[in-house]
Amino acid sequence: MTQNEPTAPEDASLDELRAEIEDIDREIVELIARRTYVADSVAQVKDERDLPTTDEGQEDRVMERAGRNAEHFDVDSNLVKAVFRLLIELN
């Protein structure tokens, strides 16, 4: 089994499943940190170029993309969009 391959419930103990969730949680936090770093870089470029700090068109595109990705992975799009709304508001 590879690191990104989900564990089948019949093949894993509760502890193994919890360890897998812990690994996924760590990856999520790492991705949030990476996204925040890049968003901070975008903000710096906008500041240097005297551009507005918000770009509603770009935010709309991010939200649309989040919805499409949610559908692709069969995840509740409202949940995914809520997470992305928080990420956008934080940066």
Each model region followed by its residue ranges:
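Domain-level signature for soluble enzymes in the chorismate/prephenate branch of the shikimate pathway
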Residues: 1-91
